[in-house]
Amino acid sequence: MSAKDERARDILRGFKLNWMNLRDAETGKILWQGTEDLSVPGVEHEARVPKKILKCKAVSRELNFSSAEQMEKFRLEQKVYFKGQCLEEWFFEFGFVIPNSTNTWQSLIEAAPESQMMPASVLTGNVIIETKFFDDDLLVSTSKVRLFYV
């Protein structure tokens, strides 16, 4: 195992996504929240989110995570897949993570134009969000969450 692989393994072993919520960015109202560690690789996670989230112009995502390891430049790359085809790609950067710390990270996700939105009935169960967790250029983990609109 290379030093990079070992480092990625150490970061992943000491990393936990404690909770996450999604809010309507305009009103601040929580639309969905969960405590499952959606960062765990190797399994397809599921999230049931309300259909009305698709009507929001922007969604505020709040993540609370703990890390045993220091990270120089913690960041996420996310791809939204519909039936296997990538529709959107997002990039988020948190930056420096203190070792043995718990952090809350808020990000704004702007919606696609309304003309490009598909109805919840078409999207439900067919959307997968793939999240890659990085420390700078070191890939730490890849996780997948299948969305169901309820």
Swiss-Prot record:
Subcellular location: Cytoplasm, Cytosol; Cytoplasmic vesicle membrane; Cytoplasm, Cytoskeleton, Cilium basal body
GO cellular component: cell projection; cytoplasmic vesicle; cytoplasmic vesicle membrane; cytoskeleton; cytosol
Biological process (GO), any one: visual perception
InterPro entries: Ig_E-set, PDED_dom, PDED_dom_sf, Rhodop-sen_GMP-Pdiesterase_dsu
Keyword Acetylation: no
Bilayer topology term: Peripheral membrane protein
Annotated GO MF terms: 3',5'-cyclic-GMP phosphodiesterase activity; GTPase inhibitor activity; small GTPase binding
Gene that specifies this protein: Pde6d
Pfam annotation, one family: GMP_PDE_delta
Protein name per UniProt: Retinal rod rhodopsin-sensitive cGMP 3',5'-cyclic phosphodiesterase subunit delta
Residues annotated as signal peptide: none
Keywords: Cell projection, cGMP, Cytoplasm, Cytoplasmic vesicle, Cytoskeleton, Membrane, Sensory transduction, Vision
Protein family according to the UniProt entry: Belongs to the PDE6D/unc-119 family.
Role this protein plays: Promotes the release of prenylated target proteins from cellular membranes. Modulates the activity of prenylated or palmitoylated Ras family members by regulating their subcellular location. Required for normal ciliary targeting of farnesylated target proteins, such as INPP5E. Required for RAB28 localization to the cone cell outer segments in the retina. Modulates the subcellular location of target proteins by acting as a GTP specific dissociation inhibitor (GDI). Increases the affinity of ARL3 for GTP by several orders of magnitude.
Chain intervals for the UniProt region annotation (Required for association with membranes): 144-150
Subunit (UniProt): Interacts with the prenylated catalytic subunits of PDE6, an oligomer composed of two catalytic chains (PDE6A and PDE6B) and two inhibitory chains (gamma); has no effect on enzyme activity but promotes the release of the prenylated enzyme from cell membrane. Interacts with prenylated GRK1 and GRK7. Interacts with prenylated INPP5E. Interacts with prenylated Ras family members, including HRAS, KRAS, NRAS, RAP2A, RAP2C and RHEB. Interacts with RAB13 (prenylated form); dissociates RAB13 from membranes.
Gene source species: Mus musculus (Mouse)
